[in-house]
């Protein structure tokens, strides 16, 4: 939906670099890959993700994710300390060094937490991760590239400040609530 509504993928580019932040990989990467396949593109695309290292094999569909990662040659990065924690600057630098500074046409910040027990603090509890995703995207995106960032609410001043910061680095900023989102 976001890909089509905002025309964020230029199919004249034969080799795309896509980076998913706090994504293991998730639905947005799957949509990106399927979109590129529909145009018989994507064979040369480079796909990277950084995600928290998860050793719990009880997570539903984790084996399905592993099959997806192998099939589409997704490079999972766990950072310099092998945790995948974006709160650590060394891990952001490690990812930028692996992918290439300002080399990506598309970056997504798709991190989130389980807020089912504390929904009222969702925005506040997400601010640190959102800031880290912004820092990483600014180091990864090409000039003219696209950054899709998932945020939950826009009530706090700091969230508005983040949007203002993004407006200084990106030509356009859009807000949307996709139909399938929570």
Predicted regions and their residues:
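Class I S-adenosyl-L-methionine
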Residues: 161, 165-182
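A short glycine-rich, Lys/Arg-flanked "PGG" loop and its adjoining helix->strand segment in the class I
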Residues: 128-146, 167-168
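Short, surface-exposed connector motifs at secondary-structure boundaries
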Residues: 11-15, 142-148
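Conserved beta-strand signature within the Rossmann-like core of class I S-adenosyl-L-methionine
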Residues: 137, 144-151, 174-178
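Short strand-turn motif at the edge of the Rossmann-like AdoMet-binding core
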Residues: 112, 150-154
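Generic recognition of short, well-ordered alpha-helical segments
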Residues: 128, 160-161
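Short "lid" loop at the C-terminus of a central beta-strand within the Rossmann-like core
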Residues: 53-54, 153-156
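The AdoMet/dcAdoMet-binding core of the Class I SAM-like
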Residues: 1-115, 119-136
């Amino acid at each position: 939906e976001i890909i089509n509504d905002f025309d964020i993928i230029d199919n004249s580019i034969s080799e795309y670099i896509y980076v998913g932040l706090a994504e293991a990989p998730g639905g947005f990467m799957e949509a990106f890959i399927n979109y590129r396949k529909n145009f018989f593109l994507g064979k040369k695309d480079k796909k990277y993700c950084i995600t928290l290292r998860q050793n719990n094999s009880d997570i539903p569909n984790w084996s399905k994710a592993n099959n997806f990662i192998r099939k589409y040659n997704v490079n999972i990065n766990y950072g310099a300390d092998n945790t995948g924690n974006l709160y650590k600057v060394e891990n952001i630098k490690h990812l930028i060094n692996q992918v290439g500074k300002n080399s990506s046409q598309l970056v997504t910040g798709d991190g989130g937490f389980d807020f089912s027990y504390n929904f009222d603090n969702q925005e506040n509890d997400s601010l640190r991760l959102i800031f880290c995703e912004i820092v990483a995207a600014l180091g990864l995106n090409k000039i003219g590239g696209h950054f899709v960032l998932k945020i939950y609410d826009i009530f706090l001043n700091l969230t508005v400040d983040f949007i203002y910061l993004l407006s200084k680095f990106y030509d356009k900023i859009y807000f949307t609530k996709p139909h399938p989102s929570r």
